[in-house]
Amino acid sequence: MEAAAAVVAAEAEVENEDGDSSCGDVCFMDKGLQSISELSLDSTLHAVNLHCNNISKIEAIDHIWNLQHLDLSSNQISRIEGLNTLTKLCTLNLSCNLITKVEGLEELINLTRLNVSYNHIDDLSGLIPLHGIKHKLRYIDLHSNRIDSIHHLLQCMVGLHFLTNLILEKDGDDNPVCRLPGYRAVILQTLPQLRILDCKNIFGEPVNLTEINSSQLQCLEGLLDNLVSSDSPLNISEDEIIDRMPVITAPIDELVPLEQFASTPSDAVLTSFMSVCQSSEPEKNNHENDLQNEIKLQKLDDQILQLLNETSNSIDNVLEKDPRPKRDTDITSESDYGNRKECNRKVPRRSKIPYDAKTIQTIKHHNKNYNSFVSCNRKMKPPYLKELYVSSSLANCPMLQESEKPKTEIIKVDQSHSEDNTYQSLVEQLDQEREKRWRAEQAENKLMDYIDELHKHANEKEDIHSLALLTTDRLKEIIFRERNSKGQLEVMVHKLQNEIKKLTVELMKAKDQQEDHLKHLRTLEKTLEKMERQKRQQQAAQIRLIQEVELKASAADREIYLLRTSLHREREQAQQLHQLLALKEQEHRKELETREFFTDADFQDALAKEIAKEEKKHEQMIKEYQEKIDVLSQQYMDLENEFRIALTVEARRFQDVKDGFENVATELAKSKHALIWAQRKENESSSLIKDLTCMVKEQKTKLAEVSKLKQETAANLQNQINTLEILIEDDKQKSIQIELLKHEKVQLISELAAKESLIFGLRTERKVWGHELAQQGSSLAQNRGKLEAQIESLSRENECLRKTNESDSDALRIKCKIIDDQTETIRKLKDCLQEKDEHIKRLQEKITEIEKCTQEQLDEKSSQLDEVLEKLERHNERKEKLKQQLKGKEVELEEIRKAYSTLNRKWHDKGELLCHLETQVKEVKEKFENKEKKLKAERDKSIELQKNAMEKLHSMDDAFKRQVDAIVEAHQAEIAQLANEKQKCIDSANLKVHQIEKEMRELLEETCKNKKTMEAKIKQLAFALNEIQQDM
């Protein structure tokens, strides 16, 4: 543990010296942790792995500001929270948990990868705040969840502009959405930014995710190949090269010209960088792939360390083989000594990374920190230009060859010359060098001013480039909206066609329903007739019951009167008894006063005698009462038997009378009902004619309104088409401007590189002159010690630079991809827009012709449909009214039945009233016979009237049926014609759609071929550049 802590502290010190943020990894896999608060995590961590624990809540991570990778898979987390402060988080793994909703990701601006597989998620509303350009989410894994709504999925994913990889199904584990028909096509249409869906590309070809994961490792392997292939001594740092160069200067006329520096374009560096670091997006899906990647990284690190050790050994060998003789020169002036110190201080640290890799890294650093470079251009310069100049001077310039010649001449000079000659030659050389320095300083000042102006121009061009990028983003959004509007219009056309088909089907159904309604109306009329008959019968029965109830009520009144009289009598008797009791009490008191008191024995004897007498009397009374009770019970039984016989006789008589009366009443009801039915038929026929006339008027008004609305929609569509054409022309102009700006940018970059290389060459000359005058043996020894210390520090810097190189390479790959996609989309859009303009013009002409025909036909159909629909509505209203009446009548029937049952019970209880009814029945019979005669005469008359009315009704029904049949035949003929015409239009439209699809497929095939040819050319160029670099 102490050794690990020491290593971490040493790395932190090295990184703080270099100016980079501290970083570290922590892994607590399968440790049985219950919560994150049990750990004391450092705020400088950038990766935390808590896989396979028992954590149920995300907490205690707020203080880790620099966290970039977080793995909380295989835990018991049910909610996403506590991540608001982790703004630098790039990857988040929450697979194999208990999460049901995606939320709490609003503040994660740098999040690029999200793995939420193997959960219970059915709500993705937490992805809506991540919409827009601010968030950069590229990879989402959602397989093995509970997402069942495709509408909700698309609503949450549409705004994720950088999303390129979406996984909803993997290795048989999917979501309910994946089982819907056409799921893949719908998602790819609505999310055009997707490149990979369910581990398959846009064309349905399977994609190997392990290859994508290992693309980062391929980048490092390419760097190692360049390291191994470079045989030139470029691994030595710049300070060592400067110190070991000979102290003899070359004149300014013999320096490398500007054209030689300008002839080395920066595009070659970029192409070599693109060939080394291919586009890759790291995707970590399985732990096995992660382990393999870590093993490969360790191997690469070991190889890099071996190469560094070899280069250090080669440097030591060079030092041993080529010992330099010490110069016997002294420090001439304090100013020269100060300049030398400043030069030594300002020389930045150099690493042992080869030329190719270091130029890549420094170019990236220059692109990232361009604004800071402008602000402090006088203090520090980008290191890649220095190395370019050093490498070019070592490889191409004849400077070293010329410097070796005077060196040999100095070694071979005879020591016999006097000291005077040497002193004079040194003074002359000093004067020449001072003049050259003065000229160089003036040229340097001029070049510095010129560089400031160039930086200003570069800043302005960068602003223009940013504006161009913004305009391209806006153009993409506009094109996306246009595609969506076009899709919506096509959907609207399909919907209208489907609605027309549905309306035709509904017409046929409405006709069938009308016939069914007519049949149903007839059946309802029959049922109404039956109900009216039953109602009349019930009314007659009610009248009878009411009469019976009235008779029973009168009998009950009589009984009540008798009971009241008996009550009055009993009350009088009770008053008399009270008076008698009061008199007896008074007499008893008087007797008690007059009586003489006996002794106890006499009193008991007298009491016993009287008790015996009273008991005998009481027994005799009980026997007499019992005999009377027996006699009365026999009489009561005899009376009950007689009463039952009388009741049966009267019931039979009453039943016979009741049957006769009911038969007569039914015949009367039938005759009256026939009359009423005939009158209703006449009224209904007149009301139907009035309703039909009103319906025709209303339908005409509705048709006029529909035609106006259609004209307005057509005008709106034409206006939208015109606006879209204007926008397309603007897009073309802007694309041309963007291309011109790109060409200008490339030219300016090449000019800047040439001029900066020139400036750096002049500075190196100045350093060389300073070292020639001030170099001594003691300074060489000190410099050697310093360089050895620097080599150790640079080996540490190498590791940090390698990490930054990886992140920078990823950023550059992404930018290159975006630029390629933009260029391809702009070219495709140009071709598609030209074809679409011609096609839209043709379609507009055809659509206008079709709209005219269809409007006329739709007007006629809509009028007919409105008439039929209004008829159906009225029939439905009548049907509902009849149902309500039926329900009311059923309720009345139930109430009548209940009343009837109660009355029957009372009638059975009060059967004593039947004796009074006999006299009334006889009178009713006489009246009934008279009524029968009158009713028979009325019946004969009603039968004759009924026959006449039925003849009239039959004639009216025949005429109405003929009219309805004629109208139905005309409607059917018109519908058949319209159906044929619409079928022809649909067939023609389908043919056009097939033609357009064929053209689009041909275009896609051509673009694929062009892409393949371009890729082959790029590979050839990359191979050629690698060969050139190896030759260098």
From Swiss-Prot:
Location relative to the cell: Cytoplasm, Cytoskeleton, Microtubule organizing center, Centrosome, Centriole
SMART domains per record: LRR_SD22
Major subcellular site: cytoplasm
Coiled-coil ranges per UniProt: 421-647
PANTHER family membership: LEUCINE-RICH REPEAT AND COILED-COIL DOMAIN-CONTAINING PROTEIN 1, NISCHARIN RELATED
Protein family membership: Belongs to the LRRCC1 family.
Name this protein carries in UniProt: Leucine-rich repeat and coiled-coil domain-containing protein 1
Organism for this UniProt entry: Homo sapiens
